[in-house]
């Protein structure tokens, strides 16, 4: 076991703070409509220009091990917010930085960190409840376009493109983002389907940047039950290899031997393949697998129809022009099913809906019909250079996640104003002790930070604008940093998804609470250059 270096108390918190400060300063410059870009060095190729907080955070590694731990803890805020909401990473980082900064001041004054933590939790619960009360449904295409544009760094063309895509495939429809071949981004709608099942092994990933498996001109094996016989599967794999097509396996489950065979073939480059579990449960799973079969022109492997795995041939497989599989979902584009068969299947589902006894069954049948009829919207992102294309694709992806969140939980005024209005509920709130009340005040002060930073990045004076916005009784009144004008932010189209704002706040508070209750740090000790180097630089502890 390698020797360890330990630091405690103020020395540990000082190191954490320096790491947090370094990462936060790099991320904060991207916030708001007038936020700046960051240039990232890459191991290969030209530098990457980004305006995404999570990408900036992921790129930072500090030389000092203890400071780097602080930076990585703050990076976790951005990563978790990105994973859960797809947007709001910079706001979460700014909030966490503000809470940690205020909290460390209180700790330096001798306050109890556990009481501070309880005060933070009480304040966050109160503010979240107020945000949910403030949220309004995202009802119109115009509101969706505004949400998307703001998330895409105030790019109206991206907002309009996403609003158009949602109009065409519905709010639950599948939207896929691809590289375009021209200078202008375009929207296409193709026959396709998306369901919420991802790959069974990360070894299937062949697109590292998007953490997905992409299979072009793919054959699709559909199994109603479990895939348990490796010997029956091998002849089919040989046929698929000869045909030169990738293979997507959709089954109730795949046993370890069969999964291992697919993974090994993928890693060796013998066959591009991927395996996913079939969507749904019980009888609904059977019906959904049959939906996929109709869409792709395949035949389901099922004892009920007398087709076993050993009898399956290439012509029994479904086909699609493209399949994209992530950790959480599978998207099939351009299925080879006959249009009349698809229309007949949709008609059958709608008849079943008329006979359904419960709202839940009707809802699920509506979803199935929508997946078959709505298709998949393809946004082909255009740009002049590869560097611009990557940056623009990231903005489109952020905008898509933001619109999904807005549809799910509604919208609130943007520009940091929603947090400023929600903090009014903290004015009369007190904790059980003085230190708990200080935790509440800590959160109240941190809720100003997103607005302050947006204004600062726009080149204006934060305190002046903060005071004017805070004094207004109108809950939607705020400052539009893009136009440098005051007014009703909802009418001006400066809106944020309530879900993104909520998750940014909750994740920021979670990490801030953990950091404020930390009293010791342990890291692998560097090799000492001499006997005197055996003590750590703080002089707080020898190596163990």
From Swiss-Prot:
Q: From the UniProt record, which GO molecular function terms apply?
A: ATP binding; ATP-dependent protein folding chaperone; isomerase activity; unfolded protein binding
Q: Give the chief site where it resides.
A: cytoplasm
Its keywords, alphabetically, are:
ATP-binding, Chaperone, Cytoplasm, Isomerase, Nucleotide-binding
InterPro entries listed in its UniProt record: Chaperonin_Cpn60_CS, Cpn60/GroEL, Cpn60/GroEL/TCP-1, GroEL-like_apical_dom_sf, GROEL-like_equatorial_sf, TCP-1-like_intermed_sf
Reaction(s) this enzyme catalyzes, per UniProt:
ATP + H2O + a folded polypeptide = ADP + phosphate + an unfolded polypeptide
- Kindly state a single biological-process term from the GO annotations of this entry: protein refolding
**CDD domains (UniProt xref):** GroEL (cd03344)
Annotated ATP binding sites: 30-33, 87-91, 415, 480-482, 496
| Compartments, as annotated in UniProt | Cytoplasm
Top-rank taxon of the source lineage equals Bacteria
EC number(s) given by UniProt: 5.6.1.7
Q: Which Pfam families match?
A: Cpn60_TCP1 (PF00118)
GO CC annotations? cytoplasm
Its function, per the record, reads: Together with its co-chaperonin GroES, plays an essential role in assisting protein folding. The GroEL-GroES system forms a nano-cage that allows encapsulation of the non-native substrate proteins and provides a physical environment optimized to promote and accelerate protein folding.
Subunit-level organization: Forms a cylinder of 14 subunits composed of two heptameric rings stacked back-to-back. Interacts with the co-chaperonin GroES.
Similarity comment: family membership: Belongs to the chaperonin (HSP60) family.
What is the official name of this protein in its record?
A: Chaperonin GroEL 1
Question: Which organism is this entry from?
Answer: Polaromonas naphthalenivorans (strain CJ2)
Gene name on record?
Answer: groEL1
